[in-house]
Amino acid sequence: MFQHTTVLLKEAVDGLNIRPDGIYVDCTLGSGGHSEYLLSRLSEHGKLFAFDQDEAAIMHARERLARYGRQVQFVHRNFRFLQEELSALGVKSVDGVLFDLGVSSPQLDEPERGFSYQHDAPLDMRMNRKQRLTAAEIVNCWPYEELVRIFFRYGEERFSKQVARKIEEVRRTRPIKTTGELVDVIKAAIPAPARRSGGHPAKRIFQALRIAVNDELEAFREALEQAIELLAPGGRVSVITFHSLEDRICKETFKKASESPPLPPGLPVLPDDYRPVLKIITKKPIVPSEEELERNHRARSAKLRIAEKL
């Protein structure tokens, strides 16, 4: 069931400088916490478009947000299709866009989704259960070199080669079908001293697989660039990230859009192409308060960055 504590709720939504009659997008509807608070700040003339690729999330949010009626429109699609979907709905610009890139707790807590190393379940990890690629296919079919690449790039796992080698060894004799079986393989591959420090030994590998299954980083990069393009002047984008890979993409995208490229000498007038597109509002990311961390330990790695369209 969708019971989920929303992270950095007021900071992320208030950071959008809500206009009561504005048009807003929640790219990561999830359990609907950010959307609900955002809708409460809108007048009857305001509008929210809420994206999620998880059908269960949309079904839950329809009930939770039913009182807002036609003020909220749900879009069951990955946020990388942000511009395409809004264009089809006749929306050319928006006043604010919100991203919360954490996997929602219900997805983590439903064993059958296969996201968690805490429960034994089929190796799945699909946000959109209609897509074909699963974690089981990656683990059992992808070559050693590809496994090393995703474990190192997406999980920043220093024992990527050892884990990939152990997976290759085990799958020669039998397929690795469940999260529990994969955890055992990971534990067997990682040296004992490393297993005893730095959190659960499977954490980084599971993160890497989840990102690879859902193509999360590329989808986010594409969606963030589209969001910036869609913003009206004065519109804002709020991004909550939970690990360094996402945060790096956000930070670099904001930085690039807030700087002028090097100018050719002798230009009498600054062309529009050379003007910065964004103003960064958060020089340093906003992090959860001690009080929020006490209420919700899953918020501990959250970072919020906000930028405004010029």
Swiss-Prot record:
One of its GO terms (biological process) is rRNA base methylation. It is found in: Cytoplasm. It catalyses: cytidine(1402) in 16S rRNA + S-adenosyl-L-methionine = N(4)-methylcytidine(1402) in 16S rRNA + S-adenosyl-L-homocysteine + H(+). Coiled coil: none annotated. GO terms for cellular component: cytoplasm. SUPFAM superfamilies: Putative methyltransferase TM0872, insert domain (SSF81799), S-adenosyl-L-methionine-dependent methyltransferases (SSF53335). Specifically methylates the N4 position of cytidine in position 1402 (C1402) of 16S rRNA. This is Ribosomal RNA small subunit methyltransferase H. It comes from Geobacillus kaustophilus (strain HTA426). The gene is rsmH.
